[in-house]
Regions:
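Short, acidic/turn-prone active-site loops that include or flank metal/cofactor-
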Residues: 2-3, 28-29, 54, 101-106
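Alpha-helix initiation and capping sites
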Residues: 4, 8, 43, 77-80, ...
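Short, charged, surface-exposed secondary-structure boundary motifs
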Residues: 8, 32-35, 59, 107-112
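N-terminal active-site beta-alpha-beta segment that forms phosphate/nucleotide-binding
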Residues: 1-37, 165, 169-186, 191-197
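S-adenosyl-L-methionine/SAH cofactor-binding core of RNA-modifying enzymes
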Residues: 19-88, 92
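C-terminal folded domains that constitute the principal catalytic or ligand-binding module
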Residues: 72, 80-197
Length: 197
């Protein structure tokens, strides 16, 4: 699920790399017949990659669950505020079982400011899920998921180089690395925004 503002986000090239993936663009998918058909496909066991108290953690007991059908994982591609809105408006997702993981590292998306520690880009999240499914013995990709991170890292490097170039860019301030940035005070007021439904 890609927010319409994220057409150049990491979800787009992740979709181009991953086989058997589909992309749906919008905000509210309740009336999207193709999306609803995929969501309710009886041939798959469907999970939504989204945090929550009732989310199953890949690292904690998911292997024992052993899905009887092939897995289908829905991923929301957008900023955290956009993801929240998409989740709220698409009511058919509210009863979809959730899947989550424990971030094992800081995001490598240096060009973009992450709101909180542990927040990852779409491609990094999908990479973590694939690795977790491999570790659980549910998937056997032969480390092909490393291609995702290779493309991602090269993209980030290129974006950083472009950001450093002087000229009429969209940035109001010079580019700085994540460790040099100050966290906005606004984020502390938005914690419920991320942790709620």
């Amino acid at each position: 699920m890609e927010h319409k503002k994220e057409k150049v986000g990491t979800g787009r090239f992740t979709h181009l790399i991953l086989k058997n993936s589909r992309i749906f663009v919008g905000i509210n998918f309740d009336q999207d017949k193709d999306f609803q058909s995929a969501l309710c496909d009886p041939d798959y066991e469907t999970f939504l990659l989204y945090p929550g108290d009732d989310a199953l953690e890949i690292e904690n007991g998911f292997a024992e669950r052993r899905p009887s059908r092939p897995l289908q994982i829905i991923v929301i591609d957008g900023t955290w505020p956009c993801a929240k809105k998409m989740m709220k408006l698409t009511t058919t997702l509210h009863e979809t079982p959730r899947l989550s993981f424990t971030p094992g590292k800081t995001s490598e998306f240096k060009i973009k400011h992450q709101p909180m520690e542990g927040c990852l880009s779409t491609v990094e999240s999908i990479y973590q899920v694939i690795r977790g499914l491999n570790a659980a013995g549910i998937e056997k990709t032969g480390a092909k998921e490393e291609n995702l991170m290779e493309v991602f890292r090269k993209t980030v490097e290129q974006q950083i180089e472009c950001a450093k170039e002087p000229g009429d860019g969209y940035r109001k301030k010079p580019f700085s690395l994540p460790e040099e940035r100050k966290t906005s005070k606004k984020w502390s007021k938005r914690l419920l925004f991320f942790r709620g439904l």
